UniProtKB/Swiss-Prot annotation:
NCBIfam families per record: argR_whole
Function: Regulates arginine biosynthesis genes.
Molecular-function annotations in GO: arginine binding; DNA binding; DNA-binding transcription factor activity
Protein name: Arginine repressor
Gene Ontology terms describing biological process: L-arginine biosynthetic process; protein complex oligomerization; regulation of arginine biosynthetic process
Keyword DNA damage found: no
Upper lineage: Bacteria, Thermotogati, Deinococcota, Deinococci, Thermales
Cysteine-cysteine disulfides: none
Keywords, sorted A to Z: Amino-acid biosynthesis, Arginine biosynthesis, Cytoplasm, DNA-binding, Repressor, Transcription, Transcription regulation
Family from the record: Belongs to the ArgR family.
Organism this protein belongs to: Thermus thermophilus (strain ATCC 27634 / DSM 579 / HB8)
Length: 164
């Protein structure tokens, strides 16, 4: 079933709506929809569509759409990820250091980058640490304040999810 354009549309819709972490899962999902695909075909499709694979933690990953295709609620996803997985934020000059739960830094940095905020020059992520380079010290201060607010919201969310 379907040509390349239809398959690409299906992949975008699947990735937008579902948590797909491996090429094998994507192959299986496309086959359920009637597409005759191989892992090699899906691998090429992923590259052509510019999909990124981000860490969700605890060994889990998810394919996400490129920046131009991020849903309008991308900031809501950043808030959710930030609230659940960020542990601390510190600032020095125009630099912020964001400490996360192990394995979550790259996913959060990816979302920050994809929002293309003018006040953020760029990010650099390790396993549990993100370096955020702000354009100015004032921008860094504003980001630190914003992130502190997200931390407060996140602690409330973590408490609600843990039932305590």
């Amino acid at each position: 079933m379907g040509n390349k354009a239809e398959r690409h549309r299906a992949i975008q819709e699947i990735v937008r709506r579902e948590e797909i972490g491996t090429q094998k899962e994507l192959v299986e999902r496309l086959r359920q929809l009637g597409f005759e695909v191989t892992q090699a075909t899906v691998s090429r499709d992923i590259a052509e569509l510019g999909l990124a694979r981000i860490a969700l933690g605890k060994g889990r990953h998810r394919y996400v759409l490129p920046a131009a295709d991020l849903p309008e609620n991308a900031y809501e996803e950043l808030k959710r990820q930030f609230g659940l997985f960020v542990r601390d934020v510190d600032r020095g000059g125009n630099l912020l250091v964001v400490k996360t739960a192990e394995g979550h830094a790259s996913g959060i940095a990816y979302l920050l980058d994809r929002l293309r905020r003018d006040e953020i020059v760029g990010t650099l992520a390790g396993d549990d640490t993100i370096l955020v380079v702000a354009r100015t010290e004032e921008a860094a201060q504003a980001l630190e304040d914003e992130f502190a607010g997200l931390l407060v919201e996140g602690r409330a969310l973590r408490r609600a999810l843990s039932g305590s």
